C-alpha cells in the first residue's frame, strides 16, 4: 500500500449526495474530525450511524487514527451530508495512494448514490400523489 504514497501534506476530495456537497481535506494526524469548524460528533448530533459512515473509508484501510479530517459541507440534511463526507474522504484517500482505490471501490465508498428528490409534476399534488378521483 505504501509503495506509491506521495510526499504531500494535504489530500483533497469532493463528495456529493442528494443536494449536499462536501469538500474533505485529509492531513496526517491522529484521527480528529472537524466539520464546518465544529467537532464531528457535535455537528452530527452524536448520531453513531452518521459517525460510522464518515469513518468507514478510513476504517476500510486501517487509517482511522492516522489522518485528521477537516470538512466544509453545505446543502441538504445530516444524512446527505454524512454520505457526501464519506465519498469525499474516499476520494481523498485515492489521491493519497492509487493502491487504496480497489478496497474502497469494493466497499462501495467511491460510488455516487444517484437517488434524489423527484420533481413535482403539474396536475399532481406531489411527485406522484394524484388528487382524489371521483367517478361522478
Swiss-Prot record:
Biased composition (Basic residues): 117-136
Gene3D superfamilies linked to this entry: 3.30.230.10
Annotated GO biological process: translation
Cellular component GO terms, alphabetical: cytosolic small ribosomal subunit
Pfam families: Ribosomal_S9
Entries under InterPro entries matching the protein: Ribosomal_Su5_D2-typ_SF, Ribosomal_uS9, Ribosomal_uS9_bac/plastid, Ribosomal_uS9_CS, Ribsml_uS5_D2-typ_fold_subgr
Stretches the record annotates as Disordered: 97-136
Keyword Membrane included in the entry's annotation: no
Keywords (A to Z) from UniProt: Ribonucleoprotein, Ribosomal protein
Biased composition, class Basic and acidic residues, residue ranges: 98-116
MF GO annotations: RNA binding; structural constituent of ribosome
Family of this protein: Belongs to the universal ribosomal protein uS9 family.
This protein's name: Small ribosomal subunit protein uS9
Amino acid at each position: 500500500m505504501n509503495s506509491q504514497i506521495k510526499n504531500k501534506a494535504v489530500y483533497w476530495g469532493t463528495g456529493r449526495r442528494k443536494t449536499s456537497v462536501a469538500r474533505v481535506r485529509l492531513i496526517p494526524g491522529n484521527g480528529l474530525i472537524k466539520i464546518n469548524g465544529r467537532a464531528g460528533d457535535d455537528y452530527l448530533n452524536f448520531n453513531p450511524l452518521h459517525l460510522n459512515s464518515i469513518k468507514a473509508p478510513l476504517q476500510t484501510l486501517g487509517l482511522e487514527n492516522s489522518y485528521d479530517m477537516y470538512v466544509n459541507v453545505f446543502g441538504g440534511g445530516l444524512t446527505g451530508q454524512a454520505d457526501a463526507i464519506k465519498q469525499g474522504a474516499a476520494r481523498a484517500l485515492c489521491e493519497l495512494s492509487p493502491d487504496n482505490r480497489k478496497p474502497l471501490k469494493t466497499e462501495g465508498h467511491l460510488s455516487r448514490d444517484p437517488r434524489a428528490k423527484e420533481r413535482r409534476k403539474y396536475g399532481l399534488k406531489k411527485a406522484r400523489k394524484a388528487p382524489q378521483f371521483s367517478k361522478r
